[in-house]
Amino acid sequence: MNCYLCRQDFLPGWTLSNVWTSQTLCPTCKIEFVKRGECGGCEDCGKPGLPLCPDCQNWRNQGRRLVTHPLFLYQTQAKAFMKRYKFLGDTALLDVFKTELKKVKVKQDWIVPIPLSPERLRERRFNQAELIARMMRGRVRLVLERTDGVAFSHQTRHERLERDNPYHVIQPVTGKTILLVDDVYTTGITLHQAASRLYEAGAKEISAVTLFRSV
């Protein structure tokens, strides 16, 4: 069979324990996806290194702690994946992570993907965070909307931290335990802004899951 990512032929290593598991990556590509849990790091965002990174310490000092569970580190092969999935629209490639996403067990009433602006959604035609969320076990609810069209990838770190909060809650969330979902955790500003709006609207507890954590 062909590897979903590098498209090279490989022979799946079937065993009694994985015979019902989809093997979509060749061994070479698979080994390059480093699971966040294998490297320790920040207990709030998964950044490799210190038990609590400076960014998360700063969030805590502001009274805005948010525990995020990234599945993998954002390294070379992960970047190649995101280029094809997010920017080239190869959404079928997400099947690579179906098994890992189904394993996620975080307390929640609703799974809430980070939304795109209407302009960005028309341009891309899909929300990459929503597709990730729908592969997880739980009830997905689109309770947030985003009203600007400025992509964070085109902003400096200072601009990301200083900009106005673009998110708005469009459905009642009072008393709900919410699991936010996004594709890549970089500075944390996206998830923290979304969480802030949800808390303002009455959410009880919020945590997050991302597919990748930048390093």
Where do the language-model regions lie?
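Glycine-rich phosphate/pyrophosphate-handling loop used in enzymes and phosphotransfer proteins
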Residues: 1-215
